[in-house]
Amino acid sequence: MPKMKTKSAAAKRFKRTAKGGFKSGNSFTSHRFHGKTKKQRRQLRGLSMMDKSNVKRYKKMIPAK
């Protein structure tokens, strides 16, 4: 049986955690910050956890690890 290939687009965007979850960067962070509050901008920094409802789909995209 052939190996499962990793979706390269998913590998670039998502990181797998030790417990099997996924982290990703936030959207709405590239421009137009004048329309966002300081709190919004602060909370959009860094990575955020993906919702549990999508984890099964992401595990198929990134089978290794």
Swiss-Prot record:
Residues 1-18, 31-44, 55-65 have a biased composition (Basic residues). GO terms for cellular component: cytosolic large ribosomal subunit. It holds the Pfam family Ribosomal_L35p. It comes from the Bacteria. GO terms for biological process: translation. Keywords: Ribonucleoprotein, Ribosomal protein. One of its GO terms (molecular function) is structural constituent of ribosome. Residues 1-65 are annotated as: Disordered. InterPro entries: Ribosomal_bL35, Ribosomal_bL35-like, Ribosomal_bL35_CS, Ribosomal_bL35_sf. NCBIfam families: rpmI_bact. Belongs to the bacterial ribosomal protein bL35 family. This is Large ribosomal subunit protein bL35.
